[in-house]
Amino acid sequence: MSEHFILQPGQLSLLSIKQILDEELSCVLAENAFELIRASHQTVKKVIDEKKTVYGINTGFGSLANQTISSDCLKELQRNIVLSHACGTGKLLPDDVVALILLLKINNLSQGYSGVRLELINALIALFNHKVYPCIPSKGSVGASGDLVPLAHLSLPLLGEGEVRHQGQVISAEEGLKLAGLKPLELEAKEGLALLNGLQVSTALALSALFISETLFETAIISGSLSVDAASGSDVPFDDRIHQIRGHQAQISAARMYRNLLAGSQIRESHRYCNRVQDPYSLRCQPQIMGAVLHQMEFVGQTLQVEANAISDNPLVFAEQGDILSGGNFHGEIIAMAADNLALALSEIGGSAERRIALLIDKNFSGLPAFLVRESGLNSGFMIAHVTAASCASDNKALAHPHSVDSLPTSANQEDHVSMATSAARRLHEMIDNTSTILAIELLAACQGLEFHKPLKTSPQLDKIYQSVRSVVKEYDKDRYFAPDIEKIKKKILDKEFSLLTLTN
């Protein structure tokens, strides 16, 4: 595998983004981008040479847009916008998210609509390639006029200001620039604004959440299948004929996943002709629930792939026509709505899993010992593990409230409608932590349920999952310290050990 990738500006796919980040590939900008970048920069220079007044080049910003700035102050203007806008707060964004922000910003500026120099783009590439990640506080953006505050923090080190993180250590920007083979840059006209305008932070946060959510989706299909077998559930509701006549492709696909996972289960065959007619909805309706989740995730993926390549700067430079146009591509409404949809999906993944845990521990529904432990009363078993799952599911319901319906005017009402895209995307990561906790508890509960069916075994596919769980967590024959077991399984989930692809290998 090549250790670098050639970035063709505007042509990132979700697959290529995953590959770049997972394999830690370095970036080389395609040479066919050079002339577009130069032409765009020359268009900006021409505005200055001809003493025209154009927003963002020789004016103030936001509600100060009517203030004209003299030519001898333009470099100071660009430095000032970075310094004044770097006022974020909160925990620092993790390195993998900052790497993705850098990648998206490089992709954005390299398409030749921002008027910046190639030298500036190469500096961002050097930071990316040397894994020198600007320290970016997580809070401060409202997702309109772009992610101004966090992108200002991204830009600070280019000026020799602020701090960066390298190999997990926070160091000064000056040290970081040396590691990347750089010296502090003096920004030219429009460059500060081009760095700050854009939706790369909200897009990166949403993409990062989407990639992890895909793993959680697969884990939920697996844990839900295990719960069906542990609770002596039926595989009839997964019959393809049922789903074909409804017609939703995602539901059809989800049902196929359940059929494939449950095929060959000795437990299922042992009660195929029992008197139980129908299972509770949390078992029976899984293809309908998870099909809807998959449908939402596919929509979110399509939206974010477009946004990963989108130009969200302002003003925009159209070098071929010599025009510089002001618009509103920096408004993150579509990202906010996509993040809200993903939040609904995550809430449903966790919420339905919590219901299955509740079913498994209830002897009246599952037919298993109360709270999945022998000598219940002396032992509490999974009683309080379910309470933890319920707590996380309830948190997710509150966190799933749509952020895109919220708006607070800023910049003296010049920016009077904002998207809240960044907070919409940021909250997804808290939901991911909650959902992975719930799924870890379901996996533990379902595997414990299988113990009571021995010597009968689950399907060959699901037995691989059972063995993986048992490799780090033994059977619960009596009460013990529970929290470490949950964390062990959460780690396996987030390390993608419970994926459908893994089962096919």
Swiss-Prot record:
Record-linked Pfam families: Lyase_aromatic
The reaction(s) this protein catalyses: L-histidine = trans-urocanate + NH4(+)
Subcellular localization, as worded in the UniProt entry: Cytoplasm
Signal peptide boundaries: none
Cysteines engaged in disulfide bonds, as pairs: none
Modification after translation, per record: Contains an active site 4-methylidene-imidazol-5-one (MIO), which is formed autocatalytically by cyclization and dehydration of residues Ala-Ser-Gly.
One GO term describing the cellular component: cytoplasm
The protein's Enzyme Commission number: 4.3.1.3
Molecular functions per Gene Ontology: histidine ammonia-lyase activity
Superkingdom as given in the UniProt entry: Bacteria
Gene Ontology biological-process entries: L-histidine catabolic process to glutamate and formamide; L-histidine catabolic process to glutamate and formate
InterPro entries found in the cross-reference section: Aromatic_Lyase, Fumarase/histidase_N, HutH, L-Aspartase-like, Phe/His_NH3-lyase_AS
Name of the top EC class for this enzyme: lyase
Pathway named in the protein's UniProt entry: Amino-acid degradation; L-histidine degradation into L-glutamate; N-formimidoyl-L-glutamate from L-histidine: step 1/3
Family per similarity comment: Belongs to the PAL/histidase family.
Name of this chain's protein: Histidine ammonia-lyase
Lineage: Bacteria, Pseudomonadati, Pseudomonadota, Gammaproteobacteria, Legionellales
Name of the gene this protein is made from: hutH
